Curated annotation (Swiss-Prot):
Signal peptide: none annotated. This is NADH-quinone oxidoreductase subunit 4. Belongs to the complex I 49 kDa subunit family. The keyword Transport applies. NDH-1 shuttles electrons from NADH, via FMN and iron-sulfur (Fe-S) centers, to quinones in the respiratory chain. The immediate electron acceptor for the enzyme in this species is menaquinone. Couples the redox reaction to proton translocation (for every two electrons transferred, four hydrogen ions are translocated across the cytoplasmic membrane), and thus conserves the redox energy in a proton gradient required for the synthesis of ATP. The Nqo4 subunit may contain the quinone-binding site. It comes from the Bacteria. The keyword Cell membrane applies. It is a peripheral membrane protein. The lineage of its organism: Bacteria, Thermotogati, Deinococcota, Deinococci, Thermales. It comes from Thermus thermophilus (strain ATCC 27634 / DSM 579 / HB8).
């Protein structure tokens, strides 16, 4: 605002004269090091006073070349790369990649391994939504829910550590099953968590849904109509908050999801409030799925017995030279899927996560393309922010729940 404009119109001028007060359009650089961007995201924001006229996202600060790297590693070696894209819901990438390679190979995953995958995937979804809830409300100035959300998340990470040995980047899912069976203490501890988690989720919803302050900050802010959401390619909670009933677990079931009973929560207005509410209600559905999975967790193998896919058991290495040779070739050369191409979509915490893999018959994929939901969902940010206020832009970013490792890859 220029000083000469202020001199022309006195401070005690009547409203009709004050309307003539002019402002300058300003460009504001937000990020890439800024807590509200949830990672290394840079936004070029054009403002007229406090009103957002335009937002241009600049990405690529976390680009690590995952797709090209995976084309120069064996199918088995790539398992260590996949969880590092979406580090908050890493089981989703592990599972999607494994399903795509298994489709190429025609592998058969044992029922117990499928059930274990579902349990861990839904637990990982819960942990991701807890981060979304805690940090999203923290961006709006609510500090207490952050500690509540991370309290339950720590319990989930402890469960992961028991099963996989890692709190992050688990590398537990294998082509044709999982690395090993669940430890004995896992199921009893998981049941303890499932006893208290539904009540805690009710508390989370009450904390923000019944808060008049949050209601004013979130209701009607960053509205994305259903037709716009579809045109922009939104998926996951951001799409369902606009009232579009699309969940990959229902539309294209995998890992036996068609045999589980769960609902798909939908929003009504497609605003920040609905995007928060839908994800909290999704947490209840994840609890339902895990409880059903525990009931059908029967004893059995956890790897495809096909020797072309699964290495020989460790105890055979002490008595069989053939087992030693095959074990060596399995981990150095890997297996050779037939020529072909596949695309397998899955439902991650952020939306449709898909792996497109092309095989030329070698031990390494010829082409890997990852359909990352965070990358696609971020395209809606300019539309959702236009006409809103600067503080509301922070809430809109949080409600889209982007993970920059998923965006840049």
């Amino acid at each position: 605002m220029r000083e000469e404009f202020l001199e022309e119109i006195p401070l005690d001028a009547p409203p009709e004269e004050a309307k003539e007060l002019r402002t300058e359009v300003m460009t504001l650089n937000v990020g890439p090091q800024h807590p509200s961007t949830h990672g290394v995201l840079r936004l070029m924001v054009t403002l007229s006073g406090e009103e957002v006229l335009e937002v241009v996202p600049h990405i690529g600060y976390l680009h690590t070349g995952f797709e090209k790297t995976m084309e120069h590693r064996t199918y088995l070696q790539n398992i260590t790369y996949t969880p590092r894209m979406d580090y908050l819901h890493s089981f989703a990438h592990d599972l999607a990649y494994a399903l795509a390679v298994e489709k190429l190979l025609g592998a058969v995953v044992p029922p117990r391994a499928e059930t274990i995958r579902v349990i861990l995937n839904e637990l990982s979804r819960l942990a991701s939504h807890l981060v979304f809830l805690g940090t999203g409300l923290l961006d709006l100035g609510a500090l207490t829910p952050f500690f509540y959300a991370f309290r339950e998340r720590e319990t989930i990470l402890d469960l992961f550590e028991w099963v996989t040995g890692q709190r992050f980047h688990h590398n537990y899912i294998r082509i044709g099953g999982v690395k090993e069976d669940l430890p004995e203490e896992f199921v009893p501890e998981l049941k303890k968590l499932l006893e208290v988690l539904p009540h805690r989720i009710d508390e989370y919803e009450a904390l923000f849904a019944e808060s008049p302050i949050f209601y004013e900050r979130a209701r009607g802010v960053g509205v994305i109509p259903p037709e716009v959401a579809i045109d922009l390619g939104l998926t996951g909670g951001s799409l369902r908050a606009s009232g579009v009933n699309y969940d990959v677990r229902k539309a294209y079931p995998y890992s036996g999801y068609e045999t589980y009973t769960f609902d798909v929560p939908l929003g009504e207005r497609g605003d920040v409030f609905d995007r928060m509410l839908v994800r909290i209600r999704e947490m209840r559905e994840s609890v339902k799925i895990i409880k059903q999975a525990l009931e059908r967790l029967e004893p059995g193998p956890v790897r495809d017995p096909n020797p072309q896919i699964t290495p020989p058991p460790r105890h055979l290495l002490e008595t069989s030279m053939e087992a030693v040779i095959y074990h060596f070739k399995h981990y150095t050369e890997g297996f050779h899927p037939p020529k072909g191409e596949v695309y397998v979509p899955t439902e991650s915490a952020r939306g449709e996560l898909g792996y497109y893999i092309v095989s030329d018959g070698g031990s390494m994929p010829y082409r890997v393309k990852v359909r990352a939901p965070s990358f696609v969902n971020l395209q809606s940010l300019p539309y959702a922010c236009k006409g809103e206020q600067v503080p509301d832009m922070v809430a809109i970013i949080a409600s889209l729940d982007p993970v920059m490792g998923d965006v840049d890859r």
